Amino acid sequence: MKFLFDLFPIILFFVAYKVWGIFTATAVAIGATLVQIAWVAFRHRKVDPMLWVSLGVVTVFGGATLVLHNDTFIKWKPTVLYWAFSVVLVVSALGFNKNLIEAMMGKQIQLPHRIWGQLNYVWAVFFVLLGILNLFVAYNFSTDAWVNFKLFGATGCLVVFIVGQSLWLSKYMKEE
């Protein structure tokens, strides 16, 4: 359910793009992210810092898209967000000795410390590569193809990555 909730702004962006075009879709994405944060704040009182980062990035890049009437900025938004996630994972591990992947998933699965460290860096590399792939699609294909990639391609990459990660991790998981 949380996965669908996280996709809420992307799905609305996709639908708005198909009906009204990139500029309306961009405004819808900004509004949907604001609604998403308001809902989380109302329901849980605490908003995840990455959701605030997402709002900042969509507002800055979406705002630039709307003000300058240039869709290049909104196309950069996913890459900036993916690369921000990557930087946060690496800096938290190297600078603060905190493994954020372990902090998020450590209660669900038990893994050796070394594997948590590897997993943290694997996610960081995945986000860098996904950002590069987003730019490749944005600059080499039509806006229509990029919008489809944003919803289906990036989500598909994430699902394939998680399945592959699960297969890799299964040999390290401790029996309960």
UniProtKB/Swiss-Prot annotation:
Transmembrane segment boundaries: 24-44, 49-69, 76-96, 121-141, 149-169
Membrane topology listed for this record: Multi-pass membrane protein
InterPro entries from the UniProt entry: YciB
Domain of life: Bacteria
Keyword Zinc-finger appears in the UniProt entry: no
Keyword terms of this UniProt record: Cell inner membrane, Cell membrane, Membrane, Transmembrane, Transmembrane helix
Family classification: Belongs to the YciB family.
Name of this chain's protein: Inner membrane-spanning protein YciB
Organism the protein comes from: Paraburkholderia phymatum (strain DSM 17167 / CIP 108236 / LMG 21445 / STM815) (Burkholderia phymatum)
Gene name in the database record: yciB
